[in-house]
Amino acid sequence: EKLSMADHKYEKWIQKDEAIIDGIDVSGEWNKMYEPREIMNYDLTYMDEITDLDGGESMGWCYQCAQCIGVCPVDNVGSYGPRKIYRNLQTGQNLFEHPDLWLCTTCSNCLRVCPKEVDMMKIMPAAREQAVLDGNVPAELQDMLQNVAEYGNPMGESARKRVRWLRKFEEPVQDLSKEDDPQPVDVLWYVSDYFSFHGRGNDAAKSMVRVFNRLGVDFGILGKEEKCDGDSQRLVGETGLFEELAEHNGAQFEKYEHNKLVVSDPHAYNAF
């Protein structure tokens, strides 16, 4: 049995070499009939490994309605989609070793429209955590995780450079890490990595300082004692590193007396 360019590997067909119907010769391609297409070789090994994870249970609830595909930002520009992840697992793909594992942005769009409440915001971090434990991490992510572990930020910058954006900046900013006897502040501002190290982030940080000062807010920053919030590290499966960062930052929050904690970005908000 040969397959033409239009045939699919899962499709089967019947064809008579000689066939005459009501006097009409329909031999060969003219009488080809396709059987119902179905996938018979299911391998649920890797599906079971995902659903057995703490947080991965809902992966098995998908019933392929494809609601998620239309709202997935990654599927709009590529071939990834929650429904496709389910189908690939169903037919024997090892997600722990596949590049698709790292494509999900955990934006929660799919959960918003899913009638079965398949929660990719829990599934993907859980699967990534297992991949991290197995050593299956893309090189660029490994570099980022190493930087955070060693330097406290994904850029690999020295902790002393966290306040470099304050040079030649005339607005008053209270750096609590530099004070021998720091006094309580009303607002403790967690500046974040990109506000501290990135050029455009520096501009945003300075704008925030101007807003605080114009409003007469009594605020302070952690300076060199601040570290990455760890939210992105948690989402890529490095739960252990996230817990270390949370413990460190939590200790700084307790060290400096304050009434309110203000953060610069949603990652820090989610993390804390």
Map each language-model feature to its residues.
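Ferredoxin-type iron-sulfur electron-transfer modules and their immediate structural context
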Residues: K2-L103
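Iron-sulfur-cluster electron-transfer modules
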Residues: M59, N76, Y86-V263, H267-F272
